[in-house]
């Protein structure tokens, strides 16, 4: 049996590099240190989950990788290029799907396709890209429906299609399934496993769900409580792919990984009120 191992981030292949990153925000009460001394390397094609209690800076770290905010100190690199702002090589999927309600699902995805590929491809090629992205998430049948005409799970799949349509090197997901019911969430998790296997995308995902993190991830990055949160541990998940949630339910390696994350969150980082 392969026991879960605590993994030294500095030994990873360096596709995404986070070097000594700190993030401080100015508030009405003064400076708030959100993150301190974040060091992490992520390999190409790796699925990494960021997990920790509310307020530990998970979304802040994801926004830094996305280039939506600039670090107070330190550097972030993707494919050896400094991250200085948003870019099509890093696509973001938020918990709120952020679809334009007056446009169809096809049109919402097509906007992203046109922005990235509009100057070098024909209209037919752009339409083909849009259709392929919707097909990838199983929504070809809903292409001409508007967001108000489809379910919450389908809306989130449109958001994923929009992100993947840009052929990003990195897919960044901020609690993408957090607002969905348990059955829909499980279905989309399984679909995401299949999509990532086919696209070989590098994924960084924020989650509060321990089982979701273990099921999907190659590495689980556990953040300490804020303020001044940092990386407490990085857990390497030794589960072979493809993964099946039913088979994993009684898998000893799965249970060991789950226990390791729960122990970190609720035994070693359990005093959230004192940290807030």
Where are these regions (language model features)?
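A short, flexible loop at the N-terminus of ABC-type nucleotide-binding domains that lies
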Residues: 11-15, 24-37
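The feature captures the beta-strand-to-loop junction immediately N-terminal to the Walker
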Residues: 51-53
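Helix-to-loop junction immediately C-terminal to a conserved catalytic motif
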Residues: 66
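Conserved ABC transporter NBD signature motif
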Residues: 74-86, 122
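Short coil-to-helix segment of the ABC ATPase nucleotide-binding domain corresponding to the Q-loop/switch region
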Residues: 103-112
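Conserved ABC ATPase "signature" region
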Residues: 114, 121-141, 194
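Conserved ABC ATPase signature
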Residues: 146-150, 154
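A short, proline-enriched helix->beta-strand linker immediately N-terminal to the Walker B motif
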Residues: 165-169
């Amino acid at each position: 049996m392969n026991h879960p191992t605590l993994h030294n981030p500095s030994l990873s292949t360096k596709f995404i590099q986070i070097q000594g990153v700190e993030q401080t925000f100015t508030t009405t009460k003064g400076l708030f240190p959100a993150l301190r001394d974040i060091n992490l390397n992520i390999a190409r094609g790796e699925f990494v989950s960021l997990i920790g209690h509310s307020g530990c800076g998970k979304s802040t770290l994801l926004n830094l990788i996305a280039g939506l905010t600039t670090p107070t100190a330190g550097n972030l690199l993707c494919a050896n290029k400094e991250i200085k702002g948003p870019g099509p090589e890093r696509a973001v999927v938020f918990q709120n799907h952020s679809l334009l309600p007056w446009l169809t699902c096809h049109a919402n995805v097509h906007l992203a396709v046109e922005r990235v590929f509009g100057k070098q491809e024909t209209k037919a090629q752009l339409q083909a890209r849009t259709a392929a992205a919707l097909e990838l998430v199983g929504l070809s049948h809903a292409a001409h429906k508007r967001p108000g005409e489809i379910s919450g799970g389908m809306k989130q799949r449109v958001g994923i299609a929009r992100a993947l349509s840009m052929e990003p090197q990195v897919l960044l997901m901020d609690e993408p399934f957090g607002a969905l019911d348990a059955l829909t969430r499980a279905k989309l998790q399984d679909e995401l496993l299949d999509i990532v296997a086919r696209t070989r995308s590098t994924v960084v995902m924020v989650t509060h769900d321990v089982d979701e993190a273990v099921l999907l991830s190659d590495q689980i990055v556990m953040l300490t409580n804020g303020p001044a949160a940092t990386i407490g541990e990085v857990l390497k998940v030794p589960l072979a792919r493809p993964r099946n949630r039913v088979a994993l339910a009684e898998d000893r390696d799965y249970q060991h990984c789950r226990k390791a994350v729960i122990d970190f969150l609720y035994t070693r980082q359990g005093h959230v009120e004192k940290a807030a």
